[in-house]
């Protein structure tokens, strides 16, 4: 029942984080200032590296913001044939052939089958002419008539100078997102709000734009309204499939944030300064990942990366194993930075058997060898220092257990610092080891998130009881916090646990967050 609402391994489980080498002298011991943005645990001490760090609303805005950095990235100027070569090169087509598992796409499902109907969430993408572009389950050809009906609904409402946003019927939501020249439709039987589902459709839209650029997309449909966009996107469906999977499982996409590899502050500083020293004229962003966790990010001064763009980059890297085979070079549009042109990303792993992946983002399509040289200079500098071995040791235990917090009733939590756009959470405990249980817990977090960000009646605090767990959500100007407790706990105990948790995060913030990001 609902309560009150107000306006890697076993070895890791008992491990502790590395001893504090040095805490920031100007950081308050008490987490109380976290009620104000910029003073919360995990707040950056210098300018943040994410633009719009709090922008959940940014995902559901009516119109796109005009990029302040417009002109930094050149318009690619590719013809349609050239673009097809870009989208179809090795980083897309061959990766698709070797990386997509039978479980990742259910293209053989018939829409009249029970299996197809049993999916709790469907996503469809079509053109304004009603041409099918993508479906999560089943084949686009078999669903072409269904998508035609969807487009007819959109057109009928628009003919009356109105916009269809959603349809609610019999426990099912149908959400529409019109982003000319595309229309995206989500059909859901989950407890997610319209706004949550709209956020997911926005991510899918940005994923498509990242492959083509909005300029090219508009150009194609201006010349031929009934163009079949699947010709250009062939082989890239696995990226959208994987992104949808991440939307169901990754708290970062829910929180509009990124999580960091827990790492001693002194080690992270050495890694960051080594990356900063390996700069080049056209280099805009240097990103070092450890799986789905951020080790460090160095950016060009006055150029900011949006967390959505970083999520798209992480999705590209995480969707393919072929980047481990050598140095990759791929065009990618970062739609929250500039929808008009491509960046070019040098993607490689520091070691073939390591999870450390380096992404160097350049504005020059001919910059492969310069970026390769940057990587070598970074490696040469880093391998001369003991920090590299410490970094590799940290990979053996890339998370931490909730037991380290010292709150017996606490099972799991999500904490986001609003000013930094970073979040932290422990590994899932034994009770939530199965995929089904993790998705169920994420569904509960999504429900809490929906209440806190309700478009009409947003809440600051929400406490919910279920048969399996009790949950608490709290949002302030400085942070968002979601906690999962044993069902035997009480609301008073949960509120008391918040202060203990914030103190623990404050004590460990040097290794859980990047407090002082560097620039070139």
Swiss-Prot record:
It comes from Takifugu rubripes. GO terms for biological process: protein targeting to vacuole; vesicle-mediated transport. PANTHER family: SAND PROTEIN-RELATED, VACUOLAR FUSION PROTEIN MON1 HOMOLOG A. Residues 1-43, 55-79, 93-114 are annotated as: Disordered. This is Protein SAND. Residues 70-79 have a biased composition (Acidic residues). InterPro entries: FUZ/MON1/HPS1_longin_1, FUZ/MON1/HPS1_longin_2, FUZ/MON1/HPS1_longin_3, Mon1. Pfam families: Fuz_longin_1, Fuz_longin_2, Fuz_longin_3. GO terms for cellular component: Mon1-Ccz1 complex. Belongs to the MON1/SAND family.
